[in-house]
Amino acid sequence: MLKRLWLIFGPIFIAGLLILLLIFFYPSTTSHNLTEEKYSAASVSAESFKERSQKVRALTDPNMRFIPFLGSSEWIRFDSVHPAVLAEKYHRPYRPYFLGQAGAASLNQYFGLQQILPEIENKQAVFVISPQWFTETDYEPAAFQRFFNSDQLTAFLGNQSGDIAAKHAAIRLLKQNPNVALKGIVQKLSKGEELSDVDQVAIDIFARFNEKQSALFGQFSIRGQLKYKEH
């Protein structure tokens, strides 16, 4: 009986284990490719908004200064005066990296920025604030969750210092995503409680897994709308 069960489920277990090992030990450093970085910078997709590795790759390129342009649906409308078009046409010494989607409001931007804080510290960024963000009621949880992922969560948990900003962000996160991963840790932050050593270990493990997963699968996520010409 056990042998038959192993023959059925054993290969699935081994395959799952191999996938986990591949993700955990996949190198998180990648070589720079300016053309691909321009593609990801101009793709203005939900994947480019959420995914870490392509953002970090572009923002750390020593041969081109990418500047984050944060907003919502403004960046989707490409025309002759779009910041990407102007930067390319007039050979400006920078390229915009667009982080915005229709429906992505301030809380999405806050958690998205957690992924790239070391890369943008003491550097420039452009932030376009939409009037639609200022409403009497919070926006729909489904809209928030569309642009939120576990890597943003662990980046936030790893960056937070237990201050009032982290507490407020944790409260809003629980409201928008009541079933968020590592909910117990987020609840502690929302109450202003200090995290234990076990909590920190859990954050580190999940953060490493998410970072490796982003490095592995992120290279396949930006392959669609190529709005830059190779030159």
Language model features with spans:
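Hydrophobic membrane-insertion alpha-helices, especially the h-region
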Residues: 4-27
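Charged, low-complexity, helix/coiled-coil-prone segments
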Residues: 24-29, 49-61, 206, 217-231
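Membrane/wall-proximal cationic-aromatic binding patches
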Residues: 30-94, 112
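Glycine-centered flexibility motif
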Residues: 71, 103, 216-218
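Secreted/periplasmic serine-hydrolase-like ester/acetyl group-modifying domain
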Residues: 155-231
